[in-house]
């Protein structure tokens, strides 16, 4: 699959218009319905390649956009969510520099 192609599992005659937020692979048991003894087998069935992880992140991004950004009367919530997420991300990547400041008596 090249960059910009549809997934191999997508069939326009069966699935209709393409939706980037939908997984077109074989359906599996949702994680919320997995029993404790089956978690290892469930994780073993996951596709852990970089392409699969990138596809999962892309689908999550599209689902978030469909829920918060694309509605006709979208509010200000997505902007606050992106702001908090970016603040958290930059705090985490700068934590190694910031953790030394808590021991300083005077700045």
From Swiss-Prot:
GO cellular component terms listed in the entry, alphabetical order: mitochondrial membrane; mitochondrion; proton-transporting ATP synthase complex
Presence of keyword Ion transport: yes
Keyword Cytoplasm: no
One Pfam short name: WRW
Keywords: ATP synthesis, CF(0), Hydrogen ion transport, Ion transport, Membrane, Mitochondrion, Transport
The protein's name in its UniProt record: Putative ATP synthase subunit f, mitochondrial
PANTHER family: ATP SYNTHASE F CHAIN, MITOCHONDRIAL-RELATED, ATP SYNTHASE SUBUNIT F, MITOCHONDRIAL-RELATED
Domain of life (superkingdom): Eukaryota
InterPro entries cross-referenced by the UniProt entry: F1F0-ATPsyn_F_prd (IPR019344)
Record's function text: Mitochondrial membrane ATP synthase (F(1)F(0) ATP synthase or Complex V) produces ATP from ADP in the presence of a proton gradient across the membrane which is generated by electron transport complexes of the respiratory chain. F-type ATPases consist of two structural domains, F(1) - containing the extramembraneous catalytic core and F(0) - containing the membrane proton channel, linked together by a central stalk and a peripheral stalk. During catalysis, ATP synthesis in the catalytic domain of F(1) is coupled via a rotary mechanism of the central stalk subunits to proton translocation.
Subcellular location: Mitochondrion membrane
